[in-house]
């Protein structure tokens, strides 16, 4: 039957990508339908019970700055919070949280059920409705046809998923859930380029059978307890719990080696490529044969369960081998396994067949987000989901897509890497992937993106008001520190010595003092008995106050580096966003090698910047391409055709 209501946007899948996509398009005013095979699993953490980490935490902060749900849900569900790399520079500091699975899922579902313009429906999707080169809806397992002008597909590991435990395997999207076999077959009919990838998960352990007296305790940060959302408060966190650490040993490694003849990875049963940066335990033992031990983190799954997640022993070995290797580790000698570990193979589609908006090049109105694009991780999925939801909403509103740049957001780095370079293995985010990471810090994600989010319709009044207060306070306080001066006469020598190691010998601004190594904001403001501090409190709220002080201190201390990076960005921007015509035939570009013209015709980059990052496309080739465009007057700056109503102060960067 044809469902009587027509929607603007349909989102297929209720994982981390799907939920953010549905919430984003609905916040923008698009009439949105979220189709999921099971409403009870919306927002489910299918693998590890944690959010964030190096690079990943940056993505979560960006999703939050754009009004997304992941950070806020983590603040409500997080049972341990830590700042990683806290002793290093601000560019690589990252927030990570252990989350209670049940509380997290409940927090996400509550937001979905209370979001205006969003409807939920429980049915697996078997088919897409395509007319010509446009998607027009989706068909469910029982034949219900839903019409919409845009569809966002976030199928996770469900597309033709196959689960492996030893040499036994069966179809499934994850343990306990069916695979999307029909939908996968339909996508293959559409001639979209695809491949197979693999990921895995460890056996889960009953905490009542763990001997914690033999383990090393790993508490979270308690003074202060971090928060994830820019609007988060530590008071939102539930009870905090420690993690625990054990190690593999030589006996563990011998057990694993002895089971490799029954490993689906090492017997050729699994064809998909696994994640390099989250390898299975058998892969670790094989690749790092000289290493005598590997650290294993025992992470609590929640406050109302005894289940523990042993982070570091993802495996698809037979269950008898899993049992033996778990029992070989200190503290786990009597451990009871609640669920076996397994590997899952699934279809993904080459992201080079996508535009930077995450819309497919072949089918108008069809967007992909999450693991279907070859990524791994909740955070990467959520970020893509939000972007796909935004651009699906703008597509039906007949507005240009929003495509964040590499110098603007980790989300821009993520998508640009995917659509220009593709993936040979599951892609995960690291700070090292961002060439402008000093400007793309966790602490300034809101400064970079919240104004854009407001313009897009993603940011509500509460977030906007908090952001404006923070932005204005940072600006005022930075200016005050730059224009407040102390001299050898006005600054007592003993105070200068206590803070700086010696008295000052000439006039300094407070900002100049703050730039010195080992000097912090509070130290500078405490000079002259506190007279060097602001006349009025920067904020009444302690969390907001801490954010303001952090922004001011980083902005002043790293001003020179940040300005140099801004100059580099401006220099590179000259050609980065020059658009390439849709119908250009690169064989006609004089001087291009056959290999380069073939690659450009195959991958169809949208901008000069994207073309320059395709493997094998040299700087010389880019120069030839620029000459070709100038001769024919074909190139135009990104966003040049944006409607006049969308230009001006705070205008959203656009891309067709």
Curated annotation (Swiss-Prot):
Purpose of the protein: NAD-binding protein involved in the addition of a carboxymethylaminomethyl (cmnm) group at the wobble position (U34) of certain tRNAs, forming tRNA-cmnm(5)s(2)U34.
Residues binding FAD: 13-18
GO cellular component terms, semicolon-separated: cytosol
Gene3D superfamilies per record: FAD/NAD(P)-binding domain, GidA associated domain, C-terminal subdomain, tRNA uridine 5-carboxymethylaminomethyl modification enzyme MnmG/GidA
Alphabetized UniProt keyword annotations: Cytoplasm, FAD, Flavoprotein, NAD, tRNA processing
A GO MF label: flavin adenine dinucleotide binding
Binding site for NAD(+): 274-288
GO terms under biological process: tRNA methylation; tRNA wobble uridine modification
Subunit details: Homodimer. Heterotetramer of two MnmE and two MnmG subunits.
HAMAP family per UniProt: MnmG_GidA
Cellular location(s): Cytoplasm
Protein name listed in UniProt: tRNA uridine 5-carboxymethylaminomethyl modification enzyme MnmG
SMART domains: GIDA_assoc_3
InterPro entries cross-referenced by the UniProt entry: FAD/NAD-bd_sf, GIDA_C_N, MnmG, MnmG-rel, MnmG-rel_CS, MnmG_C, MnmG_C_subdom, MnmG_C_subdom_sf
Family: Belongs to the MnmG family.
Cofactor: FAD
Name of the coding gene: mnmG
């Amino acid at each position: 039957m044809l469902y009587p209501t027509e929607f603007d946007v349909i989102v297929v899948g209720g994982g981390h990508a799907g939920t953010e996509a549905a919430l984003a398009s609905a916040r923008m005013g698009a009439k949105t339908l979220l189709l999921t095979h099971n409403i009870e699993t919306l927002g489910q953490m299918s693998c590890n019970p944690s959010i964030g980490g190096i690079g990943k935490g940056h993505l979560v902060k960006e999703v939050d700055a754009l009004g997304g749900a992941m950070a806020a849900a983590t603040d409500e569900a997080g049972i341990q919070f830590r700042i990683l790399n806290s002793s290093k520079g601000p560019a690589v500091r990252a927030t990570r949280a252990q989350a209670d699975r049940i509380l997290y899922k409940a927090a996400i579902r509550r937001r979905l059920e209370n979001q205006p313009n969003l409807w939920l429906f429980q049915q697996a999707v078997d088919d897409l409705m395509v007319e010509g080169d446009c998607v027009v809806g989706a068909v469910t397992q029982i034949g219900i046809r839903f019409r919409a002008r845009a569809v966002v597909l976030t199928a996770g590991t469900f597309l033709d998923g196959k689960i492996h435990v030893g040499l036994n395997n069966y179809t499934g999207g994850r343990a306990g859930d069916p695979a999307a076999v029909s939908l996968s077959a339909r996508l293959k009919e559409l001639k979209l380029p695809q491949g197979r990838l693999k990921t895995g998960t460890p056996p889960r352990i009953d905490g009542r059978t763990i001997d914690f007296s033999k383990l090393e305790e790993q508490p979270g940060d308690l003074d202060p307890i971090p928060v994830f959302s820019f609007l988060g408060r530590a008071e939102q966190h539930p009870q905090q719990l420690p993690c625990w650490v054990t190690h593999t040993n030589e006996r563990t490694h011998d057990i694993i080696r002895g089971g490799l003849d029954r490993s689906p990875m090492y017997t050729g049963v699994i064809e998909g490529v696994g994640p390099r940066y989250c390898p299975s335990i058998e892969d670790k033992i094989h690749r790092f044969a000289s290493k005598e031990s590997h650290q294993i983190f025992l992470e609590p799954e929640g406050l109302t369960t005894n289940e523990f997640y042993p982070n570091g022993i993802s495996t698809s070995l037979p269950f008898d081998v899993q049992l033996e290797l778990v029992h070989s580790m200190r503290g786990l000698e009597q451990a009871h396994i609640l669920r076996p570990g397994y590997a899952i193979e699934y279809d993904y589609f080459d992201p080079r067949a996508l535009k930077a908006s995450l819309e497919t090049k072949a089918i108008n109105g069809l967007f992909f987000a999450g693991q279907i694009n070859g990524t791994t991780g909740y955070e990467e999925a959520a970020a893509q989901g939000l972007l796909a939801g935004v651009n699906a909403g703008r597509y039906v509103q007949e507005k240009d897509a929003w495509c964040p740049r590499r110098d603007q957001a980790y989300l821009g780095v993520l998508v640009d890497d995917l659509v220009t370079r593709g993936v040979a293995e599951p892609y995960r985010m690291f700070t090292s992937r961002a060439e402008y990471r000093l400007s793309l810090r966790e602490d300034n994600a809101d400064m970079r993106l919240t104004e854009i989010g407001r313009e897009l319709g993603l940011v509500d009044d509460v977030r906007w008001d908090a952001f404006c207060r923070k932005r204005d306070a940072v600006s005022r306080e930075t200016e005050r520190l730059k224009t407040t001066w102390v001299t050898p006469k006005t600054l007592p020598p003993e105070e200068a010595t206590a803070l700086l190691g010696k008295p000052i010998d000439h006039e300094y601004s407070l900002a100049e003092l703050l730039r010195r190594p080992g000097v912090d904001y509070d130290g500078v403001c405490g000079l002259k008995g506190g007279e060097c501090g602001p006349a009025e409190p920067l904020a009444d709220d302690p969390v907001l106050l801490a954010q303001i002080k952090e922004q001011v201190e980083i902005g002043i201390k790293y001003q020179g580096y940040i300005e140099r990076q801004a100059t580099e960005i401006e220099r590179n921007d000259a050609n980065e966003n020059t658009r390439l015509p849709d119908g250009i035939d690169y064989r006609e570009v004089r001087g291009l090698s056959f290999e380069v013209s073939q690659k450009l015709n195959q991958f169809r980059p949208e901008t000069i910047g994207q073309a320059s990052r395709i493997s094998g496309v040299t700087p010389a080739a880019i120069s030839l391409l620029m000459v070709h465009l100038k001769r024919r007057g074909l190139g135009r700056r990104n966003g040049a055709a944006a409607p006049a109503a969308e230009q001006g102060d705070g205008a959203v960067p656009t891309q067709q």
